[in-house]
C-alpha cells in the first residue's frame, strides 16, 4: 500500500499537469480566435477592394459612342411641333432651358478581362506601373482584445535618495563581558647605565647609650716576660707552686684609620647619601 507521502507527491504532480493542460488550452483558444478575426478582416478588405476594382473597370469600358447614341435617343423622344427655319440668321442666345428628364439607364458593359495576380500587382506598383487607386472603406468593427503582451524589461534603477538627518542617539548599551587576559608583553630594552654616584663620608653621629655587658671574653695572651732580676743565691729547689691567676685584660687600643673605598661590585643599588657609616 503506498504511503501518504507518495500519494501527496502523485496528487501534486497530477494537479500541476491539469493546470498546465488548462493553460495550454487557453493559449491555443486565444490563438485560434486571433487567427479567425485576422482572416475575416483580410477577407472583408479583399471584398471591398474587389468591388472598387469592378466599378472602376465598368466605368472605363463604356465608349463615348454609346454615350452619344443614348443622348440622341433621349432627344428624339421629345415632340417636334415647330416650323423649320429657312436661311435665318441666328438670333441671340436664349435663356437656359429647364433641366431635362433623367435618361434611361445605360446598357451593362461586357465583363472585363481577368485581373493579374496580387503578387504581379505588387511588382507592377513597385516598377511604377498603373494601379487602381481604391478609396478607403469604412472602418470595420473593433476586434476582440488581444492576448496580454509579455512583460517589458525592468526599468533603470532610480537615483539614490537624499541622505536622511541623523537619528537621535540610542540608549547606552549594557557593559560588555570582560575580555580575556592579554598575552605578556615582550621584555623591554635595557635602560641606559645610570651616572656614577658621589662618594662622601657622613658625619659621625652622637654616641649611643652604653650597651649591656657582653659575655666574658676568652683568655688573653700571656704577658711579656719581666726584666731579669739580679742573680740571687742559689736556694734549695722548692716545690712547684700552683699556677697564678690570669691577669686583668689590657685596655682597648685606639681606633684605626678608615680604609680606602673598595672597587664597585656587580650591578647593585648605591647606598643612600644619608646613610651613616658605623
UniProtKB/Swiss-Prot annotation:
Biased composition, class Pro residues, residue ranges: 89-98
Summary of subunit composition and partner proteins = Collagen polypeptide chains are complexed within the cuticle by disulfide bonds and other types of covalent cross-links.
**Protein role:** Nematode cuticles are composed largely of collagen-like proteins. The cuticle functions both as an exoskeleton and as a barrier to protect the worm from its environment.
Q: Where is the composition biased (Low complexity)?
A: 99-109, 172-228, 236-245
Q: Which organism is it from?
A: Caenorhabditis elegans
Family to which this protein belongs: Belongs to the cuticular collagen family.
Q: Which PANTHER family match?
A: COLLAGEN (PTHR24637), CUTICLE COLLAGEN 91-RELATED (PTHR24637:SF318)
Q: Note whether Disulfide bond occurs among the keywords.
A: yes
Annotated Gene Ontology cellular component terms: collagen trimer
Phylogenetic classification of the source organism: Eukaryota, Metazoa, Ecdysozoa, Nematoda, Chromadorea
Q: Bias category Gly residues: which stretches?
A: 158-167
Looking up SMART domains in the UniProt record yields: Col_cuticle_N
Q: Where is this region: Disordered?
A: 84-109, 140-278
Q: What is this protein called?
A: Putative cuticle collagen 91
Amino acid at each position: 500500500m503506498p504511503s501518504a507521502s507518495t500519494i501527496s507527491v502523485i496528487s501534486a504532480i497530477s494537479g500541476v499537469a491539469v493546470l498546465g493542460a488548462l493553460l495550454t488550452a487557453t493559449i491555443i483558444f486565444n490563438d485560434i480566435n486571433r487567427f479567425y478575426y485576422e482572416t475575416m478582416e483580410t477577407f472583408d478588405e479583399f471584398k471591398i477592394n474587389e468591388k472598387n476594382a469592378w466599378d472602376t473597370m465598368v466605368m472605363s469600358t463604356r465608349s463615348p459612342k454609346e454615350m452619344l447614341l443614348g443622348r440622341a435617343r433621349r432627344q428624339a423622344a421629345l415632340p417636334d411641333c415647330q416650323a423649320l427655319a429657312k436661311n435665318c440668321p441666328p438670333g441671340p442666345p436664349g435663356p437656359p432651358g429647364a433641366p431635362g428628364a433623367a435618361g434611361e439607364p445605360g446598357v451593362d458593359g461586357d465583363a472585363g478581362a481577368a485581373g493579374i495576380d496580387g503578387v504581379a500587382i505588387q511588382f507592377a506598383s513597385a516598377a511604377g506601373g498603373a494601379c487602381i487607386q481604391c478609396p478607403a472603406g469604412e472602418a470595420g468593427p473593433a476586434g476582440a482584445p488581444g492576448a496580454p503582451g509579455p512583460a517589458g524589461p525592468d526599468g533603470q534603477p532610480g537615483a539614490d535618495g537624499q541622505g536622511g538627518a541623523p537619528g537621535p542617539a540610542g540608549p547606552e548599551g549594557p557593559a560588555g563581558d570582560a575580555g580575556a587576559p592579554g598575552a605578556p608583553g615582550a621584555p623591554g630594552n635595557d635602560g641606559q647605565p645610570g651616572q656614577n654616584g658621589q662618594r662622601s663620608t657622613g658625619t659621625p653621629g652622637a654616641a649611643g647609650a652604653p650597651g649591656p655587658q657582653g659575655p666574658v671574653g676568652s683568655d688573653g695572651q700571656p704577658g711579656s716576660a719581666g726584666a731579669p732580676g739580679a742573680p740571687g743565691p742559689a736556694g734549695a729547689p722548692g716545690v712547684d707552686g700552683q699556677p697564678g691567676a690570669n691577669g686583668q685584660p689590657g685596655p682597648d687600643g685606639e681606633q684605626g684609620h678608615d680604609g680606602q673605598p673598595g672597587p664597585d661590585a656587580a650591578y647593585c643599588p648605591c647606598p643612600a647619601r644619608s646613610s651613616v657609616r658605623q
